[in-house]
Amino acid sequence: MFERSDAQRMLTIKKWSYPLFWAIMLPLLPLTALIGREAGTQDYWAWGLYFVVFGIIPILDYIIGKDPSNPDEITEVPSLNEERIYRIFTLLMVPIWFGALFWAGWVFVNNDYSWFGMLGWIVSIGTVGGIIAINLAHELIHKDSRLETWAGGLLLSSVTYAGFKVEHVRGHHVHVSTPDDASSSRYNQSVYHFLPRAFVRNFINAWRLEKQYLERKGKKNISIHNELIWWYGISAALAVVFGLLFGWMGVVFFLGQSFFAAFALEVINYIEHYGLHRRELDNGKYERVTPAHSWNSNYLLTNIALFQLQRHSDHHAYAKRRYQVLRHYEESPQLPGGYAAMYVLALVPPLWKKVMNPRVEAYYQGEMDQLFRAGKRVNNIA
């Protein structure tokens, strides 16, 4: 049994583990670049951080274990919400990320990589971008503070994925776990079937949602009031700056890391709602979102790395809750690993289905006829 004193101790550990994790992880970038250059094996070391995230962290997750603790709603949550350190840290990561991104662009054009090393460096930086830029933006864009939502938009612009700011809040959170949501994967759907549709539909839907929003405000779509024009404009400006600083290869680097950051995000989206559905009601609408409509994971290390994104059930039930007070729901469907491990598994569809399909079927015993697959109910499953 997890005692209250253990929960309080875990809150203290996590409070300082968020900055400590990144104080350890970010220096690995210059370390791998330096070791590779000195040893003449820079092409292999370029993949170093990618290997750490998806090779070492899953192992450490299983060694360190899970964190089932929740802050007390009466005695702890109010004070946790008021502690500025949590907010300050997320905002400080914005200039840190931009500094790391420009430094990484310099390394890309000066480290004498072969095509293999270039790809490895782009993938490694894109992975960091997926965690810092997109994941932190995800935390920030849900907040009421204009500073935080703008910081989130700026982070998304750094990976050319500004549509997420609009579509995620106004689209995904409204239609999650229904056929109307491109970011909710279907039962038995592979990640490679899911990704192209997610990229295209979410991009189109972001512009459609922004247009509808502006029309309700009585403003023109193609105007200075359209925030997507501003955020994508910043992305274009960043691409130009990378080109001026580092030549055309700088632009290749900027766009490449953007793609792999967005790729990482959508793979995580695939994992978070795989096979889950909201029941259709008699009036044709869907039941309200609850913690039952997202996969939960309590592996401590990955939760620290991702600002408790893995407590996704609580996030969807209460989208404005800050990361430090997100809760674990034992009754939510539980992933067998942390996101880092599940990411690797998702890239191998036969293994993914072997592990996850039985879990979906067990969770929905007696309701398999309600499942959705690529927008259609799966009626041929017993």
Labelled PLM ranges:
Residues Y62-S79, H277:
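Membrane-helix interface/capping segments
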Residues D67-N70, V107-N110, I141, G275, ...:
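Juxtamembrane transmembrane-helix termini
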Residues L11-Y62, R84-V109, F116-G130, I224-N269, ...:
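Alpha-helical bilayer-embedded segments of polytopic membrane proteins, i.e.
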